[in-house]
């Protein structure tokens, strides 16, 4: 575990917004159904107004007023949803930054944790990739998709500077280049070589299963109690480029890894700014249930990445909907942001800690 306290910015004081006018306007609408604003929750960039529902409340009639609620709180992208017996009206709030200093203490050298962000209730969200065990990510230019991928890489570098091998597949060649000097980072730019890398990971997976069988171990966690096997995380910055080149072959490799690689410690984080059906195919989606949706261009793309609407109404800059495995409703989160200086500082600390003979 890297000690990065001296290399990251301290937390800034978070601003809040005034709620009085919003509450008055919302109460005028809610009073028609015998409801009112009962609570307000401020998160870094969201404000949620909560109304306690009665058993006889006409829920469908209330939900139809989404546009009216948007006018009331002066936010065209207002989000209305149910949380148990509560009606939640969520709008853009104060413009506060979620930084590494807010989240990095949730990392652990015993878990494959990723810094995600802070949700709309103010809770810090950390994802254990070992349980995910793979993630699909979608977001248009300016959504914060690349920042999210950097956050994943830095999470792994901070918690596992030596015992996690990372493959960064970056067809455009400019997103992951700064990590290339790291001994445990395999920078892959060429699309053809990227497809070969996926095949290599499939072969590595099969070899690892043979190793586990010989040791009579069920999975990598059991094996590592008496032996040593590094975890591998493959991060693909743009799946569309690979699908256009490799098509069915790429899909086959990804599906095989998604189906089997978890137990032997290989994990995928696959991103695209083109969440179309020919990129995120049905086979890929059904084998990778954990999803991260940043802002997408339309309702159709939202349904492809999340199987539901909503991602087309996000605000960009790290505003995201996170759908962990096992959940049917996504969590709205403001993602973790790190400056270029912080990123370079952490890379420098990781380089200093690495064994020169790391392989």
List the predicted regions and their residue ranges.
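C-terminal regions of RecA-like/P-loop NTPase motor modules
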Residues: 349-359
């Amino acid at each position: 575990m890297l000690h990065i306290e001296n290399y990251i910015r301290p937390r800034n004081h978070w601003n809040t917004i005034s709620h009085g006018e919003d509450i008055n306007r919302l109460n005028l609408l809610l009073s028609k159904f015998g409801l009112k604003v009962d609570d307000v929750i401020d998160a870094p960039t969201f404000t949620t107004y909560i109304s306690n529902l009665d058993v006889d409340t006409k829920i469908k009639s209330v939900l139809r007023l989404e546009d009216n609620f948007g006018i009331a709180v002066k936010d065209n992208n207002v989000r209305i949803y149910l949380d148990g017996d509560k009606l939640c009206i969520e709008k853009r709030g104060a413009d506060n930054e979620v930084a590494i200093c807010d989240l990095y203490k949730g990392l652990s050298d015993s878990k494959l944790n990723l810094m995600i962000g802070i949700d709309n209730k103010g809770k810090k969200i950390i994802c254990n990739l070992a349980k995910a065990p793979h993630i699909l990510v979608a977001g248009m230019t300016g959504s914060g998709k690349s920042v999210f991928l950097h956050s994943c890489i830095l999470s792994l570098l901070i918690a596992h500077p030596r015992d996690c091998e990372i493959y960064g597949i970056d067809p455009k060649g400019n997103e992951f280049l700064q990590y290339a000097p790291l001994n445990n980072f395999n920078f892959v730019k060429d699309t053809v070589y990227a497809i070969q890398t996926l095949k290599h990971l499939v072969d590595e997976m099969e070899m690892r299963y043979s190793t586990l069988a010989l040791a009579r171990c069920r999975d990598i966690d059991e094996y590592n109690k008496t032996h040593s096997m590094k975890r591998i995380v493959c991060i693909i910055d743009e799946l569309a480029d690979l699908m256009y080149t490799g098509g069915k072959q790429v899909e086959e490799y990804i599906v095989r890894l998604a189906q089997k690689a978890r137990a032997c410690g290989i994990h995928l984080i696959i991103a695209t700014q083109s969440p179309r059906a020919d990129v995120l195919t049905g086979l890929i989606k059904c084998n990778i249930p954990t999803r991260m949706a940043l802002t997408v261009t339309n309702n159709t793309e939202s349904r492809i990445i999340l199987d539901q609407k909503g991602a087309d109404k996000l605000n960009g800059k790290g505003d995201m909907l996170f759908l962990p495995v096992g959940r049917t409703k996504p969590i709205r989160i403001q993602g973790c942001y790190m400056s270029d200086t912080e990123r370079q500082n952490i890379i420098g600390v990781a380089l200093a800690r690495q064994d020169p003979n790391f392989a």
